[in-house]
Amino acid sequence: AYLIAQNGDPRKEEIAFAQTYFAVQTRKQELIEARLEQIERLEARNRLTASEKELSGVIFERLRDHESFARIRSKGDAALFGGRTTLDMKKHLGVPEARPLADFLPTITIKAKDLANEMTAHNVKTRDLRTEPTITSEHVGSNRVVREALAKRGIRPEQLPPAEDVRKLERRLDSDTRKLPKQVPRLGEEKGENGGGDPP
């Protein structure tokens, strides 16, 4: 049907209708896919927040120093971003100084940072690392391994463009969700059928 519609004469009413129908369906699919990608990015960012909290807790438990996590994370970022520290990447991507870098990273980079955090936290615990130099070395190593995996697939995290601010994305998704109907009627359930649209 799609090929017939696409190759048919749009002056014929049926063909014009079919072409319009398929164009609308294609656009709907594009919008659904874009929304799913946005939700995936938001979920990845939330997982990164959780892994950063876990790693921060593990580091604080061992070092009893509130600033050590930021130093260790920045050195890990330098390993992931080809020598660029957290501050360097913020400047490179135009991220406001008071905002987290990860709020402006694309999904793949967020997931890369999350994996490196998980690896570091796991190894700090299992190897019972208790000094800042050893934990830093572990985190740098985890980020380096993740960077190498990305590089083998032709991905350089520092060369990826910034993504939309995750806060704006979250607000837009929340707003869009509130605009959705509370209950979507099932096929064949229109007002007037089955007692005014209520389920049978």
What spans do the regions from the language model cover?
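Positively charged, phosphate-engaging catalytic surfaces used for nucleic-acid and nucleotide handling
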Residues: 1-200
